[in-house]
Amino acid sequence: MYIGLISDTHGLFDNELCKFLEPVEQIWHAGDFGNEHTLDEIAAFKPLIGVYGNCDDWDVREKVPLYQSFNSGGMKVLMTHIGGFPGRYDYNAFKLIEEIKPDIFVCGHSHILRVMNDKKRNIMVLNPGAAGVMGFHTVRTALRFKI
């Protein structure tokens, strides 16, 4: 399956992002949609798996959970918004990682694109950075990959 991974859209789902995501079969969103309208736009564009972020309001939180664990292409995936990275995981994310033992851990929040291997736990850690324009970052980022 061809996946488009985004996070931290903060209310922006524009033509540039649509063009980038056009070839994918499914979109994963690691939180901070920005509002319910943006979540609905993305879900209408492609099948969506998402979680809410710390900036999302109750309308978004009623539609997507704090974290999701699911299988894709034979891989166990864990997604939450605030996650950290190997050696510096958020405490709640670390508890979920230890409990679920995913093959792939997806998070957002930092607005920093990272693809890392947690060698200790044999987990691929993916943070797509920020696809929106709100925040300190100067470049919008997202990921596409095949499982």
Q: What residue ranges belong to the model's regions?
A:
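Non-DNA-binding regulatory cores of transcription-related proteins
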Residues: 92-99, 113
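N-terminal active-site segment of His-dependent metallophosphoesterases
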Residues: 1-48, 56-74, 79, 138-141
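Short, conserved loop/helix-junction motifs that constitute active-site signature segments
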Residues: 42-45, 97-100, 120
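Binuclear metal-dependent phosphoesterase catalytic core
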Residues: 72-73, 100-101, 126-147
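Short beta-strand scaffold segments in enzyme catalytic cores
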Residues: 68, 114-117, 141-146
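Glycine-rich phosphate-binding loop signature in dinucleotide/nucleotide-binding domains
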Residues: 21-23, 98-101
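Acidic/histidine-enriched, beta-strand-rich ligand/metal-binding domains
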Residues: 6, 51, 81, 104-106, ...
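Active-site environment of divalent metal-dependent phosphoester hydrolases
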Residues: 11-15, 34-38, 55-60, 84-89, ...
